[in-house]
Amino acid sequence: MRAQTIDIQELLEAGVHFGHLTRKWHPKMAPYIFMERNGIHIIDLHKTAAKMEEAGEAMKKIAASGRKIMFVATKKQAKEIVSELASKMGMPYITERWPGGMLTNFVTIRKAVKKMSAIDRMKTDGTFDTLSKREKLQIERTRENLEKNLGSIADMTRLPGAIFVVDAMHEHIAVSEAHKLGIPVFAMVDTNTDPTSVDFAIPANDDASKSIQKIVSYLYECVVEGLAERKSQKEEADAKAAEAPKAEAAPAQEAPKAEEKAE
C-alpha cells in the first residue's frame, strides 16, 4: 500500500477511526475529529490518510538519505507488530521499557551495548569457561537483560535521524528526549493527545492492534521505498566510480600513437 493508494474503507475496517471517550479528549485534536458517537470521538479518516501520506513521504526521504529511524512501541498490543516490521527494515526499535537517556545520554547507552559485546567475546575466547558457576550465572543474566532492552539497537553507532512512536502520550519520555536533541518525531496520536507535541502527527486509534498494524505497515512500505532508492543511487555511484579509471586510461593509451604520427 503506497501513499497515493490509501484505502479509506480499509482504515475504517481496521477501526482506525475510533477515538477515546469525549470527556478524555484533547482540544487541539478538534481539527481531526469527524463526530461524536455514543460518547466516543470519531476521527476523520480523510485527514488521517493525508497525514499518513505526509509522514510516509518524510520517512521515505530520511531512509533514502541513509539515516536510521527508531521505532518505539512499548504498549503490549504494538510490540510484536513494530518489532517484526522494524526488523525487516533493518531499523532500530524499542519495545520494552524505554531506557532513560536512550537519546540524551547515548554515550552511556553505547557503553552498555559494548558490555554486551564484551560478554560475547568472553564466550568465544574461553574466558567465560574459567569463571565460577555463580559468576557465569550473573553474567548470563546481565547479558539477557541487556539483550532484552538494547539488543535491537546493537548496531546503532549514532543517534537516529528520526523516531516513530505508536502512542505519543504513552511514549512521552522518548518524545521529550527527541525534542531536546532536535530529532523529528513521527507518531500515532489518539483523540486524548496533543498533536502539536510531535512533528508529524497521524490521528488514529493507537490502542487497537489492527489500527496499529495498518498505520505501521503503510509507513513500512514508505521506508522500504526509501531504502530501495538509496541502494539504487549507491549502485549507480559505484558504477560511475568503476568507469572513471577506464575513461582516464583511454587517452593515455592513444598518446603514443599521436607521437608516432608526429615523427
Regions found by a protein language model. Name each.
Residues 1-5, 225-263:
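Intrinsically disordered, compositionally biased charged tails
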Residues 2-147, 153, 157, 171, ...:
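Acidic-enriched and Gly/Ser
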Residues 70, 164-165, 186:
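Structural motif
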Residues 153-176, 180-181, 245-263:
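Charge-patterned, long linear interaction tracts outside catalytic cores
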Residues 187-193, 262-263:
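Compositionally biased, low-hydrophobicity segments enriched in charged and small polar residues
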